[in-house]
Structure formats: structure tokens, C-alpha cells
Amino acid sequence: MTTYREVSAAEYRIQADEKLEAAVRRIAHEQVEQAIAQLRGIDTHNAQGSIHQCRKHIKKLRGLLRMVRPSMGRAYRPANNTFRDAARLLSPYRDAHALLATFDDAIAADPEGVPAGGLGVAWRELVRRADDSTRSVTGGSAEVQRALELLEHGAEGIDGWKLKGSGWNA
């Protein structure tokens, strides 16, 4: 049985018989399509995982762009900025959940260090923010819609990417 990790890693490889420019485009399309699928599939049960996976695909895509940056010329900056902006729109959601998880981990690591009055007010506020964030992204938030638009716009430009040079010099 092939695991997701094995499939994911295989997709991010340049095949021996593939031209570099074609491989870069293929990999970019795969990553952006997977990022879009994660956002389109968001619901209250998978919101945190979907945002995380979407941002991971964007990170891989931007890493790919950085690898070929010298060969992309002026096409690099607008492509990178488009995908960067899409990920940035999703970061407040990630931040709200990461802050709550970090708070919970810190309390679990040292329960004796919790003040006598407790930290219930702070914890409830963090839970409220995380819950509000989940409702926002699953309710068709403007940020998620804009991130989808940016990803789709970025995907449209991939086939126009030209790499200067040849082979590993590209």
C-alpha cells in the first residue's frame, strides 16, 4: 500500500526523462491544484487540517519557484507574490489555532506553574478566537475566497513560465 507521504514525495520529483521546464510546470500545477482542493474541501471537521495542508502545498510551490528563480527572470516575482499572498490570507486562522495549541501544551508541560487563580479567562479567549476562526473559514470567508482566487490566478500563469538556460543550468 502506498502512503500519502510516498505519493506526495514522488510528485515533487523531476523524472529522468523529463525536461526541466516541463517538470517545474508539472510540479507547480500539482501543488497548486492540491492547495485549491484543500480550500474547496473545508468544513468544520477538517478546517485546521485543510488550512495546514493548503499552506504546505503553497510552501512547496514557493520553494520550487526559489530553486528556479535565476532562470525565471521577471516572471519570478509576480508568481511568488501571488502564492505568498494566498498563504498570507490564511495565516490568521493558522495563528489562532497554533496559539491555543501552544497554550495547552505549556499548561500540560507544567501544571504546577499555573497561578492559583488559574488561566481560565485567557484560555477561554483563545478558544473563542480559534472557534471564530473556524466559523469564518468554513462559512466562506472573504479571505478564503480571495486565497482561492489568487491560487487560481497563479495556476493560470504556470504554463507561461519560461526557464532561461538548459539542463541543470536552468
PLM regions and their residue ranges:
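Cationic, histidine-enriched alpha-helical/coil surfaces that engage anionic ligands
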Residues: 2-170
